């Protein structure tokens, strides 16, 4: 009864247009007030504990680093390198766009930031070289989803905070899937470009490739600093986020000099707005998770599933369907915060690795970002290209099949996500 009332209140609040954070907090408050033996003081305590959550401290720093990279000329240099490296292939500019998205994802941790940073540069060039606006928009919209799969990823940090798994293992688990999805998108572009008979630009010389690589070196070095620092035991993922923000500030202002000190207040303000929005959702979601735990809702669901004899593959199928539906109506952070506390204990009971479950959830969130009506990448791509939302949706949907095939591979071949972290850290 308590479970039904909690979720009815939650979805009723969201259905009438209430923000996700307030919906989570209000439904939790009413459940505690009416049904729980917890005191209302536990709410304020839980909200205060959120501000002390060490893992969550990584979020504002990764947000700031991503914004500095977006506005500091790093994306522009990454695009030049990608075009020099693979631009001569069939569909080379589009393939270079995917590669640039992969590179920028490795320093930004955000899908919308990746779409804006790369899309605003490459789409104009693609149109000048004979690509249709629909083709360009579809590629960038889908390739931009790599921003939350290739580490560092803000969504992965949130999942790790909610489920208390290792952020380092989550980051490492995203490397191979991120590269695989990038290669699958490149292969799809190559095949489609053959149908359209697009003429690639001339092949760059090794000198041009090397020059572009050197020019983008300082931006690419951030990936080495973050991942090398974490796995070399130099600093924790949270400390790595702080280092990445300081490093991004340094190269944007003093190395590339694309930002001046006058530009910094605007960057800090935008980063603060994003951080406040995310942390307000996280705080209320952790309160929601607290109610779930005290009422033993996840444990009760897990026991029921085990009793009916549901196989792990069946559970993962149900999880994918549930997440794909949720992705149509909610943004990734909200979905992770609401569903991870419920799915995590069930997966553990069925013997499914929590890291594997985390990657499955992230891939589903990627798909949700390119599906209407609230797919965030659709809105961002619309703003970058000047196309209306329906046009962007039609342009993105053909490429969605690649993401769905990739989801099946990641779901039922766990070694794709678990192989590298198990090799590095041990099982």
Regions found by a protein language model. Name each.
Residues 1-427:
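Alpha-helical transmembrane segments of multi-pass membrane transport proteins
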């Amino acid at each position: 009864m308590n479970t039904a009332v909690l979720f009815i209140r939650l979805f009723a609040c969201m259905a009438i247009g209430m923000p996700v954070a307030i919906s989570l907090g209000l439904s939790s408050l009413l459940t505690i007030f009416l049904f729980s033996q917890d005191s209302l003081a536990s709410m304020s305590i839980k909200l205060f504990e959120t501000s002390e959550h060490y893992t969550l401290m990584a979020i504002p720093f990764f947000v700031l680093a991503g914004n500095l990279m977006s506005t500091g000329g790093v994306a522009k240099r990454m695009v030049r390198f990608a075009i020099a490296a693979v631009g001569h292939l069939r569909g080379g500019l589009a393939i270079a766009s995917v590669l640039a998205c992969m590179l920028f994802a490795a320093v930004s941790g955000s899908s919308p930031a990746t779409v804006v940073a790369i899309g605003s540069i490459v789409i104009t060039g693609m149109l000048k070289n004979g690509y249709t606006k629909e083709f360009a928009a579809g590629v960038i919209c889908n390739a931009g989803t790599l921003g939350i799969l290739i580490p560092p990823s803000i969504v992965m940090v949130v999942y790790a905070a909610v489920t208390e798994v290792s952020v380092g293992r989550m980051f490492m688990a995203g490397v191979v899937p991120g590269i695989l999805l990038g290669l699958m998108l490149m292969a799809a572009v190559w095949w489609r470009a053959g149908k359209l008979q697009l003429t690639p630009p001339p092949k760059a010389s090794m000198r041009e490739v090397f020059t572009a690589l050197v020019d983008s070196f300082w931006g690419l070095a951030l990936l080495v600093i973050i991942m090398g620092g974490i796995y070399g035991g130099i600093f924790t993922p949270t400390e790595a986020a702080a280092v990445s923000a300081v490093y991004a500030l340094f190269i944007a202002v003093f190395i590339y000099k694309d930002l001046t000190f006058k530009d910094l207040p605007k960057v800090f303000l935008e980063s603060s707005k994003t951080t406040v929005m995310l942390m307000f959702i996280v705080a209320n979601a952790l309160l929601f998770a607290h109610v779930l735990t005290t009422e033993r809702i996840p444990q009760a669901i897990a026991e029921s599933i085990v009793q009916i004899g549901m196989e792990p593959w069946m559970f993962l199928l149900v999880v994918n369907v549930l997440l794909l539906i949720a992705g149509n109506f909610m943004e990734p952070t909200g979905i992770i915060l609401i569903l991870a506390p419920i799915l995590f204990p069930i997966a553990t009971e069925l013997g499914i690795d929590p890291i594997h479950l985390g990657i499955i959830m992230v891939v589903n969130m990627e798909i949700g970002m390119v599906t209407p009506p609230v797919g965030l990448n659709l809105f961002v791509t619309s703003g970058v290209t000047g196309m209306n939302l329906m046009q962007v949706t039609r342009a993105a949907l053909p490429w969605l099949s690649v993401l769905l095939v990739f989801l099946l591979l990641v779901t039922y071949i766990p070694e794709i996500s678990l192989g590298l972290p198990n090799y590095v850290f041990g099982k």
